[in-house]
Amino acid sequence: NSIGLDKSELAIKTAEKNRKLLGLKNVQFFNQDIFEYNQSKADLLLCNPPYLAKHEIDSLEQSVRDYDPLSALTDFKKGTSFYKHLISNFNKLVKKNGIMLLEIPFSAVTDDIISINKNFNANKSLFYKDLEGKNRVIKIY
């Protein structure tokens, strides 16, 4: 079984539509904020958290600002609050021997995310690089 969380009702409706189109049976979606989630632990937690810092919003291309809700792009702070929450709560969110995969940006907050991982994570971790050789995903296990 798999679950999906999003605080956006529109995102949940879109996910449900895609689930049906793909014929997926064992997937449930919940309209819930990850900061308030305290249900069952996951074997695999996969997330592309909002990572833009508040000051980066103005430099976004207009097409991005028109298409995506700002809450999907930024935490309206430094861009790291989701990472800090997810990484520091790894053992509450992920089962023993489970895995957390987080997309990370190539931006000013990348080093902050790496520091958060070093400060809050007692588990193993590694980074996957993109085609340009830049860290793009952190795996915590």
Each model region followed by its residue ranges:
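Mobile active-site "lid"/loop adjacent to the S-adenosyl-L-methionine
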Residues: 51-81
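Residue-level signal for inorganic ion chemistry
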Residues: 15, 48, 64, 86, ...
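Conserved SAM/SAH cofactor-binding pocket of Class I
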Residues: 1-57
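Conserved Class I SAM-dependent methyltransferase catalytic core
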Residues: 77-140
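Residue-level marker of structural boundaries
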Residues: 20, 66-69, 109
